Amino acid sequence: MDKSESTSAGRNRRRRPRRGSRSASSSADANFRVLSQQLSRLNKTLAAGRPTINHPTFVGSERCKPGYTFSSITLNPPKIDRGSYYGKRLLLPDSVTEFDKKLVSRIQIRVNPLPKFDSTVWVTVRKVPASSDLSVAAISAMFADGASPVLVYQYAASGVQANNKLLYDLSAMRADIGDMRKYAVLVYSKDDALETDELVLHVDVEHQRIPTSGVLPV
């Protein structure tokens, strides 16, 4: 072997990477990408903050409390005369109520007016006695005592009013799914008669995850 061949062979040997160095670098890059993705998700979660009545939707899994999901029910108030009231107890699906000891953290009501809506309604959620028949007199008294937040939803000619949600926090009360039958959504039609096809109420109940939560919004 002449000198040039020896030099070339030495150069080639120096270029050869160490055994395993390439795979170690790839593994480090992959770990860095995973960490970056996790930090990105964390930043998005922190930026979103806790759900408030100003969020365009209630909560997805990243906005629920850790270990929580939510179930939704829809209420269609019947015709309500001017100055009169409507009340409906919260009845969750059987697949949820069988886990009656799971804690509930929040209830949110979203008001969805239909095209004919051109009135003003007051909406609240209250814990009511089991003996209550949700009569007009009983509901009127609950609106008047100031014990619960009230959403005043008014007709907006330009479309849906921005403030169309009411958030009710039950965390301090340690309420559970079994307690939900003790709560009711109450509506007061202040200025006009409300027709049956004018308003829809979506009620979101945030609760601890249950075994069937795979079919619930997450």
UniProtKB/Swiss-Prot annotation:
Renumbered residue ranges of the record's region Disordered: 1-29
Presence of keyword Acetylation: yes
One Pfam family matching this protein: Cucumo_coat
Location of N-acetylmethionine modifications: M1
Top-level division of the source organism's lineage: Viruses
Annotated compartments: Virion
One annotated GO molecular function: structural molecule activity
Biased composition (Basic residues): 11-21
One GO CC annotation: ribonucleoprotein complex
Compositional bias segments (type: Low complexity): 1-10
Keywords noted in UniProt: Acetylation, Capsid protein, Ribonucleoprotein, RNA-binding, T=3 icosahedral capsid protein, Viral nucleoprotein, Virion
Family, as annotated: Belongs to the cucumovirus capsid protein family.
Protein role: Capsid protein. Probably binds RNA and plays a role in packaging.
Domain notes: The N-terminal arginine-rich stretch does not seem to be the major RNA-binding region that allows formation of an infectious ribonucleoprotein complex.
Protein name, entry field: Capsid protein
